[in-house]
Regions:
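Short acidic beta-strand-loop surface patches of small beta-rich interaction domains
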Residues: 33-43
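Short glycine- and acidic-rich boundary segments immediately preceding or forming the N-terminal edge
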Residues: 31-34, 55-118
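Short HxH-centered metal-ligating active-site micro-motif
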Residues: 130-149, 185-186
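Active-site/substrate-binding loop(s) of hydrolase catalytic cores
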Residues: 144, 151-153, 157-292
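Stable alpha-helical elements in mature extracytoplasmic
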Residues: 17-21, 28, 86, 90-93, ...
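Primarily a LysM-type cell-wall glycan-binding module
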Residues: 1-28, 48-67
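Proline/glycine-enriched tight loop/beta-turn segments at coil->beta junctions
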Residues: 116-118, 125-131
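Metallocarboxypeptidase
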Residues: 237-374
Length: 374
């Protein structure tokens, strides 16, 4: 994935020098330090969308004059706009995110059935007090969750980078103390199928029409490209999900596979959690305006208080127990006894219309900010 360095300064910066430069350029100190901690001669400027290329300057004053027109504002289209993503568009967006907010770390945690990368976006705080995982688009026709999550992330990063933003100090605290892990598109093949059709993936429509119940419209497709529901793939009473469904074969929805963790996307997500043992997990789905927060009594006591805060800021209804098993959140709670929440965004029938986006985002952004408070 392409990244670009901007603003090359031909001298070493000590810590005091970094603070002075950040102040003169109007960049939050934490974002500036985290962006430049491994750089000695390339000055990386979070919160600026600069033209590509390496630009050489003689002084910080020259840098300040050059970058001034390129500072991002909360009202800018890239920050405040509404974007829809397939896997290719996601990759382009991640490249922009890395260029504009260099303190973000982007890596591949696995690959889909069709070898599409599954990306994780990370923050690496100086003082690691908490770890929080957020994910979206486990289900293919719930791709609007990716749009919501990335818009919120851009808002968080801009607030951390710009001291005049209303949530600057809150964002700085998150950046300094919380290791964020974000997987914006768990099911890239499925999203591509729903958004672009099988031909875009080099696949035959006839095969997928059979899996899709005879329909050539893929808007209701939830599964991965092999017809396995990724959110029924985890070893947390998986057998219940397997035996309760009449279909024992791949399908556009609900089929849990022949056994747990057969699918590369599910394996990647399980391995990520096993490596990092997050303190809190938030899985974004649609729809229902509900928050599922318990699993058979394995959830920690603090979950009850946390979900009350989520309800207060979002208006979403907390539901402790649900007749559902083998989901990522279910397994996470069962495996680690840590906080796990499935947040069902919006109301209606999947895929939700983008006409709902603004309403969904307003409620969800408040919940996500709250989720980063530990």
């Amino acid at each position: 994935m392409k990244t670009t360095s901007f603003g090359k300064i031909e001298w070493q910066l000590d810590e005091a020098g970094r603070d002075a430069v950040a102040k003169q350029l109007g960049i939050g100190k934490a974002a500036f330090h985290l962006s430049n901690q491994s750089s000695t001669d390339n000055l990386l400027l979070p919160g600026y969308r600069l033209p590509e290329g390496v630009h050489v300057f003689d002084s910080i004053g020259d840098v300040q004059r050059f970058i001034s027109p390129y500072r991002l504002q909360q009202s800018d289209d890239w920050i405040n706009g509404t974007f829809e993503y397939d896997s290719a568009q996601l990759e382009e967006e991640l490249s922009r995110l890395k260029a504009v907010f260099p303190f973000l770390h982007i890596s591949v945690i696995g690959h889909s059935v069709l070898d599409t990368p599954i990306y994780e976006i990370r923050t690496e705080p100086v003082q690691h007090l908490h770890s929080i995982h957020l994910n979206a688009s486990f289900h293919a026709n719930e791709w609007i969750t990716t749009s919501v999550l990335l818009k919120w992330l851009k808002s968080l990063c801009l607030a951390a980078s710009d001291p005049v933003q209303a949530r600057h100090y809150e964002a700085v605290h998150i950046l300094q103390t919380t290791a964020l892990s974000i997987v914006p598109m768990v099911n890239p093949d499925g999203v591509d199928l729903v958004r672009n059709g099988p031909e875009s993936l080099g696949l035959h429509r006839e095969e997928f029409t059979l899996l899709n119940g005879g329909y050539t419209d893929y808007r209701e497709w939830k599964a991965n490209i092999r017809g396995v529901d990724l959110n029924n793939q985890f070893p947390a009473y998986w057998e219940i999900e397997y035996y309760r469904h009449q279909s024992k074969a791949p399908s556009y929805r609900d089929y849990p596979g022949r056994e747990p963790l057969t699918e590369p996307e599910a394996k990647a997500m399980a391995n990520l959690a096993l490596r990092k043992r997050f303190d809190r997990l938030i899985a974004l789905h649609t729809q229902g305006e509900e928050i599922y927060w318990g699993f058979l009594g394995h959830e920690p006591a603090i979950s009850k208080e946390t979900v009350k805060r989520f309800e207060l800021v979002s208006g979403y209804k907390p539901i402790q127990y649900l007749d559902s098993y083998a989901g990522y959140r279910d397994w996470f709670i069962y495996q680690f006894h840590n906080e796990g929440y499935t947040v069902e965004l919006g109301l209606g029938k999947n895929p939700l219309s983008m006409d709902q986006f603004d309403s969904i985002y307003e409620k969800t952004k408040r919940l996500l900010w709250e989720a980063c408070k530990c």
